């Protein structure tokens, strides 16, 4: 496995942490639900979060490809800076409880009876905005962007699925830790892009 593929896998894991944290919160709020309900919720979390996290970096990549022509010499600094800012934002959110606030604002009491697709869509978009910004940096990695976005989607879907079950069994105490890990990985990749691209 080459270094670029390792970078994409690390980027995918870091970007998946927002969706993972939200999935843990959704799972924790579904602790009294039936196994069939939790399975449906886990499948929907995987689908919504995976698709959103796969499409948004592709949009960022395409926009970045246009901008790189104009900003070629500054691109590594801009791309690395974006990743560092996103990582710092994730750390800030982890230490200020913003994931819990998103869940509380978007949580519909009816989710206990039926999965709210509008809420799932909103959460998927909210957790994937960072992925669109990170997609810009895919232009700086020597890897097929389509493959990278597919890897990001698959990794996020897996984290979304298992996050529901982890939240159901352990509660919300892991949410912030997932955000911290994701933030640190994004900062590390950002520094690498700035220094070695």
Curated annotation (Swiss-Prot):
The keyword Hydrolase does not apply. The chain crosses the membrane at residues 8-28, 43-63, 66-86, 123-143, 146-166, 177-197. Its main location: membrane. It comes from the Bacteria. Keywords: Cell inner membrane, Cell membrane, Ion transport, Manganese, Membrane, Transmembrane, Transmembrane helix, Transport. GO terms for molecular function: manganese ion transmembrane transporter activity. InterPro entries: Mntp/YtaF (IPR003810), Put_MntP (IPR022929). The keyword Plastid does not apply. It is a multi-pass membrane protein. It is found in: Cell inner membrane. Probably functions as a manganese efflux pump. Belongs to the MntP (TC 9.B.29) family. This is Putative manganese efflux pump MntP. It comes from Psychrobacter arcticus (strain DSM 17307 / VKM B-2377 / 273-4). The lineage of its organism: Bacteria, Pseudomonadati, Pseudomonadota, Gammaproteobacteria, Moraxellales.
